[in-house]
């Protein structure tokens, strides 16, 4: 085998490596990237700011947010919905005014045609000795094909006038949805549904700055086991305490009583937290990011 035959450009088969390389270099095809540990947030970090929470709150689906960040997000979404609703109302009023103008013009044209018909008198006396074909020879109406061609010509677009081109259509604004949705789960989100979370620090004497710099920051509120990205955790709704799922299964579910506040618990009061990423594929976290791009089809 010659040296030229060992090059990757000499093969007759389009290999998988060449396909991935061309997909990354071109602007077509869905791009897929395997995320590392550095690209996944920790279990106690906000889903919006990706920073450790100072005043954490959790949704019913287990997504943790910084209270200030999620309230600012909800306020921004409500302002955007109000702006879209204002544009929709403006379009609706403009369309209504246009329909009123058209109805008014149609009524005026009908009234004018009726008045013209009533006020018109016969200018030529009818001659009983002439045939209809002779009298109507001078005022012959155009045939049906000519009328249809003229009407079709009026409806054809003028490509040299921007307002009459087929693409020059005003984009209609759809009625916006007034519901604010969670940025992670996509479900409806309300401020009253946010539950405060109270983490139990490893050392109560360490301030917040020193706590953030440590790798192991929080422990279970009941068993004092260390919490981390690889440990399944849950939030108890009445007290907001964070405990491990092992504690929930072995201790709390026997009596269904909150060990911190003493309130009666239900199944919906035990909210499982969405865990952070460990970098391993078996951690239960989606470690693959996709970017949808145009696809070339033959």
Curated annotation (Swiss-Prot):
A Gene Ontology cellular-component term: cytoplasm
Protein name: Nitric oxide synthase-interacting protein
Gene Ontology molecular function, alphabetical: ubiquitin protein ligase activity
Substrates-to-products reaction catalysed: S-ubiquitinyl-[E2 ubiquitin-conjugating enzyme]-L-cysteine + [acceptor protein]-L-lysine = [E2 ubiquitin-conjugating enzyme]-L-cysteine + N(6)-ubiquitinyl-[acceptor protein]-L-lysine
EC number: 2.3.2.27
Keyword Cytoplasm applies: yes
Gene transcribed to yield this protein: nosip
Membrane spanning stretches: none
Keyword DNA-binding: no
Family in the record: Belongs to the NOSIP family.
Positions of the UniProt region annotated as Disordered: 126-157
Any one Pfam family match given in the protein's UniProt record, by short name: zf-NOSIP
Protein function: E3 ubiquitin-protein ligase that is essential for proper development of the forebrain, the eye, and the face. Negatively regulates nitric oxide production by inducing nitric oxide synthase translocation to actin cytoskeleton and inhibiting its enzymatic activity.
Motif Nuclear localization signal, residue range(s) on this chain: 78-101
UniProt cross-references to InterPro entries, sorted A to Z: NOSIP, Znf-NOSIP, Znf_RING/FYVE/PHD
């Amino acid at each position: 085998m010659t040296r030229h035959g060992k090059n990757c450009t000499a093969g007759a088969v389009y290999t998988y490596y060449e396909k991935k390389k061309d997909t990354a270099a071109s602007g077509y095809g869905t791009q897929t990237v395997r995320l590392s540990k550095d690209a996944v947030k920790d279990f106690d970090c906000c889903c919006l700011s990706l920073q450790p929470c100072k005043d954490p709150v959790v949704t019913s689906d287990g997504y943790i947010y910084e209270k200030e960040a999620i309230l600012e997000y909800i306020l921004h979404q409500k302002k955007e919905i109000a702006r879209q609703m204002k544009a929709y109302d403006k379009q609706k009023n403009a369309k209504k005014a246009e329909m009123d103008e058209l109805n008014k013009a149609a009524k005026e044209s009908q009234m004018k045609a009726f008045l013209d018909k009533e006020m018109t008198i016969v200018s030529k006396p009818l001659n009983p000795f002439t045939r209809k074909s002779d009298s109507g020879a001078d005022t012959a109406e155009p045939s049906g094909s000519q009328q249809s061609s003229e009407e079709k010509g009026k409806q054809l677009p003028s490509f040299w006038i921007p307002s009459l081109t087929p693409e020059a259509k005003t984009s209609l604004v759809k009625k916006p949805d007034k519901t604010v949705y969670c940025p992670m789960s996509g479900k409806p989100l309300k401020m009253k549904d946010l539950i405060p979370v109270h983490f139990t620090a490893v050392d109560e004497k360490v301030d917040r700055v020193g706590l953030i710099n440590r790798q192991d920051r929080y422990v279970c509120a009941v068993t004092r086991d260390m919490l981390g990205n690889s440990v399944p955790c849950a939030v108890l709704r009445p007290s907001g305490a964070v405990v491990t799922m092992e504690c929930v299964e072995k201790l709390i579910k026997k009596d269904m009583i909150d060990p911190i506040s003493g309130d009666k618990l239900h199944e919906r009061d035990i909210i499982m937290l969405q865990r952070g990423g460990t970098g391993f594929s078996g951690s239960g976290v989606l470690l693959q990011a996709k970017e949808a791009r145009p696809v070339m089809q033959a």
